């Protein structure tokens, strides 16, 4: 069964967005079909960011009611065009974010030449404007969503190994951390580094503007002889925490972040991004490692 997807015309959608904004400020703004009677003149800014249509007779009636009758005489619309072009501000645009400098005025055309579809009708101080195209509304900051959080993980190191090793790992084994590092990640992005101190950790560097993509690939210089030699990247996660943007910014100011009690007893062991087990952070001779307490291997060795 095919999906019934509602089609949205971007031009009309932008007009509708502006209409809603104008109505919020007490202006009359409606999307409607203009009459195709009489003559029309299209206006736009020099950058062609917006365009609108006016009826010369309507414009004259608001500028000079005494001259409005001239609009019905043959060729009177063509006299309005140079007048509009020569006037610095022929009207006040009812849409605040639009520019009216260097107005482009086209020659009059009959109503039959108007574009298909609805136009946005807004009254200005010089009569009605029928907008055909409008740019996007300026972005308005709605504040930070307070409920939005980002998952951080504090990684103490990693080791590169092969798939065949995973089948031989069991509870009580110690996985050595070959590459010691103290890095903060949000998803696959490295945010910075941290130091372990008494009572918690302190984030030393945190650069949200220039975050790095984590490299999860293990390079090999030769063709793999079999599936058991597929590369596996083990990652050891000391702690995870979901934070708000305000909390994330505070971390960059070297604020002490308290660790949960016995965090060193619950280090997560990730393999290619998948949780396989957890254990205790230990030091074997001069090398950090994790002694496995729980192991979720598919081999059946361990739990």
Swiss-Prot record:
Pfam families: FliMN_C
UniProt keywords, alphabetically: Virulence
Family, per entry: Belongs to the FliN/MopA/SpaO family.
The protein's name in its UniProt record: Surface presentation of antigens protein SpaO
Functional description taken from the UniProt entry: Involved in a secretory pathway responsible for the surface presentation of determinants needed for the entry of Salmonella species into mammalian cells.
Gene Ontology biological process terms from the UniProt entry: bacterial-type flagellum-dependent swarming motility; positive chemotaxis; protein secretion by the type III secretion system
Organism this protein belongs to: Salmonella dublin
4Fe-4S as UniProt keyword: no
Domain of life the protein comes from: Bacteria
Gene3D superfamilies membership: SpoA-like (2.30.330.10)
Organism lineage string: Bacteria, Pseudomonadati, Pseudomonadota, Gammaproteobacteria, Enterobacterales
InterPro entries registered for this protein in UniProt: FliN-like_C, SpoA-like_sf, T3SS_OMP_SpaO, T3SS_SpaO/YscQ/SpaO
């Amino acid at each position: 069964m095919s999906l019934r997807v509602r089609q949205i015309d971007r031009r009309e959608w932008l007009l509708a967005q502006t209409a809603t904004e104008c109505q919020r400020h007490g202006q009359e703004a409606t999307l409607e079909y203009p009459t195709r009677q009489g003559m029309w003149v299209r206006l736009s800014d020099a950058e062609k960011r917006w365009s609108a249509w006016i009826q010369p007779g309507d414009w004259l009636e608001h500028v000079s009611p005494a001259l409005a009758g001239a609009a019905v005489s043959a060729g009177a619309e063509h006299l309005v065009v140079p007048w509009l072009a020569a006037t610095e501000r022929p009207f006040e645009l009812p849409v605040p974010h639009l520019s009216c400098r260097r107005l482009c005025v086209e020659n009059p055309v009959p109503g039959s030449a108007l574009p298909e579809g609805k136009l946005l009708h807004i009254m200005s101080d010089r009569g009605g404007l029928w907008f055909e195209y409008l740019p996007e509304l300026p972005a308005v900051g709605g504040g930070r969503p307070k409920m939005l959080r980002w998952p951080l993980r504090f990684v103490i190191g990693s080791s590169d190994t092969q798939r065949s090793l995973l089948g031989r790992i069991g509870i009580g084994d110690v996985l050595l951390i070959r590459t010691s590092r103290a890095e903060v990640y949000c998803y696959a992005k490295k945010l910075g580094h941290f130091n372990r101190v008494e009572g918690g950790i302190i984030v030393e560097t945190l650069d949200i503007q220039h975050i790095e993509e984590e490299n999860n690939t293990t390079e090999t210089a030769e063709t793999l002889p079999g599936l058991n030699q597929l590369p596996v990247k083990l990652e050891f996660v000391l702690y995870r925490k979901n934070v708000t943007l305000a909390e994330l910014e505070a971390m960059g100011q070297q604020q002490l972040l308290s660790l949960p009690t016995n965090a060193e007893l619950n280090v997560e062991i990730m393999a290619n991004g998948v949780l396989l087990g957890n254990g205790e952070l230990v030091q074997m001779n001069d090398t950090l490692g994790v002694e496995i307490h729980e192991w979720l291997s598919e081999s059946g060795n361990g739990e």
